[in-house]
């Protein structure tokens, strides 16, 4: 359900700056590869995956759909994914996949959760 919050260019830029202020020391500008499994029409994916990593000169690997979760295996197999953002459902599904849990991607530096507290 939409919360009716007005998004302005200034709001978006402030959000990008907030994200960078928290993670700047962990982002290797121009070298990161972020997996975008959430749709960009959600503000979290739009600001974090697209705007933040675009600003950092990084690559976005777009997953057309994370369902079934095996769709993401190809992205992890073919790209050196360094960051992934998601929601509880996505992370729970990944951790229940044998290919992910048995051999986690060596290049993955960080996972960031949005939408609710990570469980």
Per-region residue spans from a language model:
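Short acidic capping loops at alpha-helix termini that bridge into adjacent secondary structure
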Residues: 3, 29-33, 106-108
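Conserved AMP-binding/adenylation subdomain of ANL enzymes
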Residues: 13-33, 43-82, 93, 97
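Conserved S/T- and glycine-rich ATP-binding loop of Class I adenylate-forming
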Residues: 1, 12, 34, 40, ...
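Conserved AMP-binding A3 loop
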Residues: 1-17
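Short acidic-hydrophobic sequence patches enriched in Asp/Glu that either
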Residues: 7-11, 68, 86
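Short, flexible micro-motifs
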Residues: 7, 48, 60, 116-118
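Adenylate-forming
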Residues: 38, 65, 81-119
